[in-house]
Amino acid sequence: MARTQAEPPASQPDARAAWLRDQLERANYAYYVLDQPDLPDAEYDRLFGELQQLETDHPDLVTPDSPTQRVGGEVAGGFTPVVHDAPMLSLNNGFADEDIAAFDKRVADALGKTTDLAGSVTDPVEYACELKFDGLAISLRYEHGVFVQASTRGDGTTGEDVTENVRTIRSIPLKLKGAHVPALLDVRGEVLMFKRDFARLNERQRAAEQREFANPRNAAAGSLRQLDPKITAQRPLSFFAYGIGVLDGMPMPDTHSALLDWYESFGLPVNRERAVVYGADGLLGFFRKVGEKRESLPYDIDGVVYKVNRRDEQDRLGFVSRAPRFALAHKFPAQEALTRLVAIDVQVGRTGAITPVARLEPVFVGGATVTNATLHNEDEVRRKDIRIGDTVIVRRAGDVIPEVVGALLDRRPDDAAEFVMPTECPVCGSKIERLPDEAIARCTGGLFCPAQRKQALWHFAQRRALDIDGLGEKIIDQLVELNLVRTPADLFNLGFATLAELDRFAEKSAQNLLDSLEKAKHTTLARFIYGLGIRHVGESTAKDLAKHFGSLTPIMDASIEELLEVNDVGPIVAESIHQFFAEEHNRTVIEQLRAPGKVTWAEGPPAPRAPQGVLAGKTVVLTGTLPNLTRDAAKEMLEAAGAKVAGSVSKKTDYVVAGADAGSKLAKAEELGIPVLDEDGLHQLLEGNTP
């Protein structure tokens, strides 16, 4: 949404008010009609508050179409307009503790509450406290207990008829429970989407290669306002009732809390996170309690709502033009804010992932000052069209890493610069590469890069790699932080005195680790390849590489075409292997590991062409305990005969070899009609005889 009008200074109140009205109306249209909000809530509130203050200071600036004189947005095309029997008003906002104290004082004074000599209220106001949901407000109309119509808030006076869409929301009863129901009931509440449902919806959107929703609020609004109710029916929407418009045929409950209990008796969904409290202290206590559990709630909220509980006191307090005097929304610190992006750097993760990071002018958001925010990856920067120098929307929720949501294109300076992914790692100078079909670019210096050092050492020491017993994460942390080990090759230079000085590392532990390192010097080529931590190269692929090439040097020098000849190595894996060995830093570390007195293994000639016997190319599954063969021995014999040993039974399985205590794999094989062999049958196959 373009905002091209120049921003006038505060010294020109007429022009400033006109500019503020324009900004707010454009934001309202994007939010309520397009369902594509482009202005953070905090920025909207700031502009709205400034306009309110201007109009208070200069009453002649108030216009009938000012956003301060209305509630919501225009009615969009495509839906039938609905005039509300009672206006759907919004709420005034409070942010600081002082705002809440001032609200309580205004209410207490208006109700004539008694005070002591110190000015403290001796008869505090009773309030009902609820959550402020981040969804879409709607009105539900029931006639004689039967649901007949649903409408959106719209501009507060006229909304949109979304009856057929709301019928698809399963938590909304189409008929109220109980024998005694009002002749007419206008229920006010919020349509929202739970966090888990939002995550599942976006998973489906990704699978269908459709646009993902930015947040649960956008998803709920977009789903409710679909022209096709069948689409709405596929969206996991929920509803909570929290207010009332009109009531006919039954007396109104005496308190707001009683109204919500009454709703529950009718089968309407009402949120249980609510309380009745007294005075400003009670309000602030509820706010803090909710704030502590906010992130663990299954839905998004952006604050809490306070309402004078007694209905007769609500009536005495009445309304102002756009909001009730008896209620206030106490909003949490903004989770989104505007600031300027001054630079884009890249960070290197422990697995080599290169992440663009926005360097920001400091901004207070989500309860903390933020100067850095993630941009996720190069594609995200391009998709969001974020450039250096832009005014950007920054989001921070709870403990989540701050992120840049988008840029305000109308505020883009002429010299805004596009982000260019560097070609070399900023930490170690190795090449940065990006595999086909992957969103993440990576540093290829896995064995050398300091940013990947701990991960490389941990992987190298794994049981299925060099099997260095006693080299756990805490020991690795100390070795790296004390600069005693930079690459896996340095492990074999460690001495007893150095290890014995490590924190909480006794002499016996030091000797055990040295013994384990000595043992690790004698390994296999497959274990060594796996221990290098090449992306996409697991234990099975490492074995295939070792078997195919016979020695390490041919693997290091192999072309992508030669790598593709290896069993189960596809284009992505071949590219990853080739990139790893093409990086000179990695080759240097490997040569250090192969130096005299370091790591050795038995090498042999390249594997002959694949066997042509009855097992060549067959898939075999082992299950249970064989009388004379261990599972590893059986696996080696099968692989030597050209078979592939799989871990699970499927329609592609050719044989299942079952021993004692065979379980679900045997049952699955029998169900699929796959031949089942015992140990004798296995030997017959290995000898070339079909069973």
Curated annotation (Swiss-Prot):
One of its GO terms (cellular component) is cytosol. The keyword Metal-binding applies. It catalyses: NAD(+) + (deoxyribonucleotide)n-3'-hydroxyl + 5'-phospho-(deoxyribonucleotide)m = (deoxyribonucleotide)n+m + AMP + beta-nicotinamide D-nucleotide. It comes from the Bacteria. PROSITE patterns: BRCT, DNA_LIGASE_N1, DNA_LIGASE_N2. Gene3D superfamilies: 5' to 3' exonuclease, C-terminal subdomain, 6.20.10.30, BRCT domain, DNA ligase/mRNA capping enzyme, Helix hairpin bin, Nucleic acid-binding proteins. Residues 610-691 form the BRCT domain. The active site is at residue 132. One of its GO terms (biological process) is DNA repair. It holds the Pfam family BRCT. Keywords: DNA damage, DNA repair, DNA replication, Ligase, Magnesium, Manganese, Metal-binding, NAD, Zinc. Zn(2+) binds at residues 425, 428, 443, 449. The keyword DNA damage applies. One of its GO terms (molecular function) is DNA ligase (NAD+) activity. Its EC number is 6.5.1.2. NAD(+) binds at residues 41-45, 90-91, 130, 153, 190, 307, 331. Its cofactor is Mg(2+); Mn(2+). DNA ligase that catalyzes the formation of phosphodiester linkages between 5'-phosphoryl and 3'-hydroxyl groups in double-stranded DNA using NAD as a coenzyme and as the energy source for the reaction. It is essential for DNA replication and repair of damaged DNA. Belongs to the NAD-dependent DNA ligase family. LigA subfamily. PANTHER family: CHROMOSOME TRANSMISSION FIDELITY FACTOR 18, DNA LIGASE. This is DNA ligase. The gene is ligA.
